[in-house]
Amino acid sequence: MSAELETIEHQLEDSITSLRNNGVRITPQRQAILKFLIASHTHPTADEIYQALSPDFPNISVATIYNNLRVFKDIGIVKELPYGDSSSRFDFSTHNHYHVICEQCGKIVDFHYPQLDEVEQLAQHVTDFNVTHHRMEIYGLCKDCQDK
């Protein structure tokens, strides 16, 4: 088993444990949606998840996808990214990171820069806020759009 596949399986197991600890029943569809999100590096929309899973789950609906994404979001294992167009994208991530977003095609790429975590501490110190989180987006043109 490859290291990436082991990581996906480990994250899936941890997420299923979190869901169960919150009283959520694990269905085959719910598990498939979660596994797709964990393995995806594209920050998919609900429609993209539906397109990917509907061949294996012919009875799945877009509403089922949205309902499960809401459950995952409420528990904190998925983040909704309401960037750009009217379709939110969804991100499975268990660590802090930022997003670089293509202004032309909407592609979102993860960007890790741990030094920015200090921003929260400084903001809290300077403002006396109890800082809970922060979000940063960087915009530009991805390589594919530059080459067009």
UniProtKB/Swiss-Prot annotation:
Keywords: Cytoplasm, DNA-binding, Manganese, Metal-binding, Repressor, Transcription, Transcription regulation, Zinc. This is Peroxide-responsive repressor PerR. Zn(2+) binds at C102, C105, C142, C145. It is found in: Cytoplasm. GO terms for molecular function: DNA-binding transcription factor activity; transcription cis-regulatory region binding; zinc ion binding. Its main location: cytoplasm. The keyword Transcription regulation applies. The keyword Nuclease does not apply. Gene3D superfamilies: 3.30.1490.190, Winged helix-like DNA-binding domain superfamily/Winged helix DNA-binding domain (1.10.10.10). One of its GO terms (cellular component) is cytoplasm. It comes from Staphylococcus saprophyticus subsp. saprophyticus (strain ATCC 15305 / DSM 20229 / NCIMB 8711 / NCTC 7292 / S-41). Belongs to the Fur family. Residues 1-84 are annotated as: DNA-binding. One of its GO terms (biological process) is regulation of secondary metabolite biosynthetic process. Manganese-dependent repressor that controls a regulon of oxidative stress resistance and iron-storage proteins. May act as a hydrogen peroxide and organic hydroperoxide sensor. InterPro entries: FUR (IPR002481), Fur_C (IPR043135), WH-like_DNA-bd_sf (IPR036388), WH_DNA-bd_sf (IPR036390).
